[in-house]
Curated annotation (Swiss-Prot):
Function: Probable mitochondrial mRNA stabilization factor.
Protein name from the UniProt record: ATPase synthesis protein 25, mitochondrial
Organism: Sordaria macrospora (strain ATCC MYA-333 / DSM 997 / K(L3346) / K-hell)
GO CC aspect terms: mitochondrial inner membrane
Disulfide bond annotation, renumbered to this chain: none
Length: 705
């Protein structure tokens, strides 16, 4: 019996060959069925196909092979070869199974693991010598229990003066895997510290239920507003990416002790500033790369060590000398004095600091050449340098009083000597004035220290110090954002905006840098929950831009944007000082259309314009010496003055400015008004507009003065 072509084609692969062979052989032992009718089939040409392994016996054969279909006469030989190969494969499989069954599973040798595939936890940072006992378990807890990655420990105890965080700072950094991991880990860390008697403050932490509440409120607000939420990149108050856990100062002593000078005499009493401040910075990976706090604090530490190396631990002789050719204090801008205790401003949301120490402070006697006599005129004038050093280290009131005296001393110097006082020495070390200033602000409360630093920056800018430019202001802004200036008043932030735009820039790139720095300051205001689009901010930017001169297209575009806010933005009513400053700067640059637009701001808020504002307008119009402008101003403003509620009374200063405007509008009005006799009515003279105004003003000035 011969195989049909269909059977031969079905036995193309090795498995099909074996199955077809069994069917072919078994056909001899069974009765033959009647053959079906013969059908003509068209043989297709030889094709290529892939073989596969359907049974374990063929595991040793190649996975994929390409074959060409052989001719019909070669098929019987192929079938015999396939049967022989299958028998060999089955025999080898059975042999391997029998051999493997003899070895129990616990004696089978596993394949060796490559050393690089074994996971080893990263080493923990080394604990600095002299650290508190809490540091080692804290580092292990943050690494093992919280699962923070990339731990880094910075020893900042060598920074002099110490930062606002506290003395002897040790800062631990860790990276969280996600925002949720960050908040959960910080919450566990605070609870772990609380169990050990440490009350830590975690800035940026959302509690266990607070996050759910904020998300629920955000979704409800988005539903009510018909929006999907805040735009991308906006601060939603939920995604922080950074939590600062401040453990406070470990080992702080609140016991008062007696201080003695080098002669063994009692110099005072106070609480010593001791202990170590521990701060744990937990951040997400992207936030950590963005802030780069390690780089910032490492740079601060390096610069502090460089200064200490230059000083070599010894203060040189002071160079405080007064010269007879001192310039007046009006030569450069005098900033607002430093204050230390709270008191309300004109607006309830503005606070400032004041102290009674200012009333008792005397002028600094700068005729000596050492640190102790630089404090002469104070109650500690006979103390030794070590006594002064101890007092400045412990007594906050003494530091504030010293800052007041240094302020007065700087204003008493000629401009060139004042510039040298706020500069570095030839060897790169700070001057005696700057060294004493740094010592005075050391360990002061954050608000007082920043007020003192901003005062010094403003004084240096007024002196046109070359090192106090935009780069210096940018460094201060970054330090404020990272070290914290939460207690600083709003007025100081506005002063910072004035300092930024008070630097004249002649290129568009410089103006864009100013705009970028101003946005950083505005962002800090926004993070405090204060309104940023307000008249004090807008007026500060407009005034500074106009006074420095608008020299570039970018500066003109920026000025136009802020001027548009005066009439379009929904802001609170400005103060009297803000309106007067805008009137001054627009009158100085002869921008009269904008001048009158500012004059009409108060009526838009239904507010009464004051006597001081009317006086300023009349003075500015009189200074121009233009008849048409003086005539229009008198016709508009005098009539509006009578219709204010209550009416504005004429003060002596206002009367003087009005007389000057009348002389410009009608030069003969004054002489005609004086020549009119009370007994004789001259209708020709009385009908003149400004003659009647002159007589009316002099009649009302008596009761309005």
């Amino acid at each position: 019996m011969s195989a049909t072509p269909a059977v031969l084609r079905a036995s193309a692969c090795s498995a099909c060959r074996f199955s077809a062979l069994r069917l072919f052989v078994s056909s001899f032992a069974t009765p033959r069925a009647p053959l079906p009718a013969a059908r003509t089939r068209i043989l297709s040409p030889a094709v290529t196909y892939s073989t596969f392994r359907p049974s374990p016996r063929l595991l040793a054969s190649p996975a994929i092979e390409e074959h060409a279909e052989p001719a019909a006469q070669e098929q019987p030989n192929k079938i015999e070869d396939a049967q022989a190969e299958a028998n060999k494969a089955e025999a080898s499989t059975e042999t391997s199974n029998e051999g493997g069954a003899d070895v129990p599973w616990y004696l089978q040798v596993d394949a060796p693991t490559h050393p690089t595939l074994v996971h080893e936890p990263p080493p923990l940072p080394d604990i600095p010598e002299g650290s508190p006992k809490l540091m080692e378990p804290l580092v292990k807890f943050v690494s093992d229990e919280l699962g923070m990655d990339n731990l880094d420990l910075l020893d900042l105890r060598a920074i002099d003066p110490p930062p606002a965080l506290g003395p002897e700072v040790l800062m631990l950094f860790g990276t969280a895997r996600s925002e949720r991991h960050l908040h959960v880990s910080a919450d566990r860390l605070v609870r772990w510290l609380r169990n050990r008697g440490i009350s830590a403050k975690a800035d940026g932490l959302l509690g266990r239920n607070e996050l759910k509440t904020k998300l629920r409120r955000k979704a409800r607000k988005a539903k009510l507003l018909g929006t999907t939420g805040l735009p991308s990149g906006a601060d939603d108050g939920i995604t922080t990416g950074w939590i600062c856990v401040n453990l406070g100062t470990i080992g702080w002593s609140d016991m008062e002790m007696e201080f003695k000078d080098e002669n063994g005499m009692t110099s005072g009493f106070g609480v010593p500033q001791s202990g170590t401040t521990i701060v744990v910075q937990l951040m997400t990976e992207t936030r950590r790369e963005e802030l780069a706090l390690e780089k910032l604090w490492s740079g601060i530490l390096r610069r502090s060590l460089e200064r200490q190396d230059k000083i070599d631990g010894k203060l040189p002789d002071a160079t405080f000398t007064t010269a007879p050719d001192t310039v007046s204090r009006s030569t450069f801008l005098r900033p607002t004095p430093i204050r230390s205790s709270g008191r309300n401003r004109k607006r309830p949301d503005r606070l400032y600091f004041s102290t009674s120490a200012r009333q008792h402070a005397k002028a600094v006697d700068v005729s000596q050449t050492d640190l102790a006599t630089a404090m002469a005129g104070w109650e500690y004038s006979n103390a030794s340098p070590s006594t002064i050093d101890n007092l400045l280290a412990q007594d906050t009131d003494s530091k504030v009083q010293l800052l007041f005296q240094m302020q007065d001393y700087l204003y008493s110097l000629p401009k060139d000597q004042a510039l040298s006082a706020v500069s570095l020495c030839e060897d790169g070390s700070p001057s005696t004035f700057m060294r004493l200033f740094n010592r005075a602000i050391e360990n002061l409360p954050s608000a007082q220290a920043w007020e003192a630093r901003l005062w010094l920056e403003k004084a240096a800018r007024a002196l046109q110090h070359p090192d106090h430019g935009l780069a210096r202001l940018g460094d201060l802004i970054q330090e404020m954002k990272l070290s914290g200036a939460a207690d600083l008043s709003r007025e100081k932030f506005v002063d910072f905006l004035r300092m930024i735009f008070a630097i004249p820039e002649t290129t568009d790139a410089g103006v864009r840098q100013q705009a970028s720095l101003s946005m950083d300051v505005i962002d800090m205001l926004f993070s405090r929950g204060e309104k940023v689009i307000e008249f004090d901010v807008v007026v500060a930017v407009i005034e500074s831009l106009l006074r420095t001169g608008v020299r570039t297209p970018e500066a003109r575009r920026l000025l136009t944007q802020f001027e548009d806010l005066l009439g379009e933005a929904q802001m609170d009513c400005p103060t009297e000082d803000e309106i007067i400053r805008l009137l001054d700067v627009y009158a100085h640059y002869r921008a009269w259309e904008k001048f009158w637009n500012v004059w009409r701001i108060f009526p838009r808020y239904c507010e009464r314009r004051t006597e001081r504002m009317y006086t300023k307008v009349y003075e500015r119009i009189a200074a121009v010496d233009h008849q048409a402008m003086a005539t229009d101003a008198l016709r508009w403003c005098v009539e509006e003055m009578w219709h204010e509620q209550p009416p504005v009374r004429v003060t002596p200063a206002m009367l003087k400015a009005l007389e000057a405007c009348i002389r410009i509008a009608d030069p003969e009005a004054e002489s005609l008004a004086k020549d009119i006799d009370d007994r004789i009515s001259d209708a020709q003279y009385m009908d003149r507009e400004f003659v009647r105004l002159w007589l009316t003003l002099h009649g009302s000035a008596a009761w309005g003065a």
